[in-house]
Swiss-Prot record:
Gene3D superfamilies: 6.10.250.1580
Cellular location(s): Cell inner membrane
Membrane disposition: Single-pass membrane protein
Native source species: Parvibaculum lavamentivorans (strain DS-1 / DSM 13023 / NCIMB 13966)
The keyword Cell membrane is assigned to this record: yes
GO cellular component: plasma membrane; proton-transporting ATP synthase complex
Keyword Cell inner membrane: yes
Single annotated GO MF: proton-transporting ATP synthase activity, rotational mechanism
Protein name as it appears in the record: ATP synthase subunit b 2
Length: 187
């Protein structure tokens, strides 16, 4: 319906057949025409010469410059990496040296502390031993005094018992003779 309406619009002409002019296409495809080979070869040589000059004067130097810059940048990066490597190795060496010094210092401090504590412990031990020796000496004196007192009591008891026994057996006793006899036996 729309096609019929468009076809019937005023001012539009209907073309019913297609016409193709034959003269323009009669010779075939121009690059394959043998009569134009010479001019085509000339233009081909001129085009390649122009392209060669353009490439050799403009494009190839730019590419060479880019490659040279890239090579230089890579060399600079490698040099910088080598410098960083050396700096890193120096930093590691300094770190290891500082670590070794810190360990040595820590061991020195630990040894000094150990020695000081051992000295302090030894001093305290000697002081305690001296106090204990003093207490032992006092205890021995007290024991000796207690022993002497006990022996005096034993002597007095022994003299009294011996005197009583002699008095009961003999009827009469000499106190001084009994004391001498007890002293002789106790010593």
């Amino acid at each position: 319906m729309i096609a019929e309406a468009m076809a019937q619009e005023p001012g539009s002409e209907l073309i019913s057949e297609t016409q193709v002019p034959d003269a323009e296409h009669a010779g075939g495809f121009p690059p394959f025409d043998a009569a134009s080979f010479e001019s085509q070869l000339v233009w081909l040589v001129l085009s390649f010469a122009a392209l060669y000059l353009l490439m050799s004067r403009v494009a190839l130097p730019r590419i060479a410059n880019v490659l040279e810059e890239r090579r230089d940048r890579i060399a600079d990066d490698l040099d910088q990496a080598a410098q960083f490597q050396l700096q890193t190795e120096e930093a590691i060496g300094a770190y290891e040296k500082a670590l070794a010094e810190a360990r040595a210092k820590a061991q020195g401090i630990a040894q000094e502390t150990r020695d000081r504590l051992q000295e302090e412990t030894e001093r305290q031990r000697l002081a305690i031993e001296a106090r204990l020796a003093e207490k032992i000496s006092e205890a021995e004196k007290q024991i000796a005094a207690t022993k002497d007192a006990a022996l005096q009591n034993v002597r007095a008891v022994a003299v009294d018992v011996a005197d009583t026994i002699v008095a009961q057996l003999l009827g009469d006793s000499d106190r001084s003779a009994t004391e001498r006899a007890v002293d002789t036996e106790l010593s």
